[in-house]
Amino acid sequence: MYYKRIRELREDNDILQKDVAKVLNTTQQHYSRIENGSTEITADRIVTLAKFYNVTSDYILGLIDSKER
């Protein structure tokens, strides 16, 4: 699921939830719910995260396993 990928990307890059929340223009609490899978993420936020982490949206969605763009 996508939420595992976005948590993995954040942790691998040593980034705090509050910092990713700022990128997404949301609160840390809301981002935490996205990362835990209890709240869905919108397509535009997936694209924003893909650009932020320099990966494809397909990688975040789990459609491919390569992080390469």
Regions found by a protein language model. Name each.
Residues 6, 20-21, 31-34, 60:
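Conserved hydrophobic/aromatic packing and binding residues within compact polymer-binding modules
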Residues 35, 53, 64:
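DNA major-groove recognition helix of helix-turn-helix
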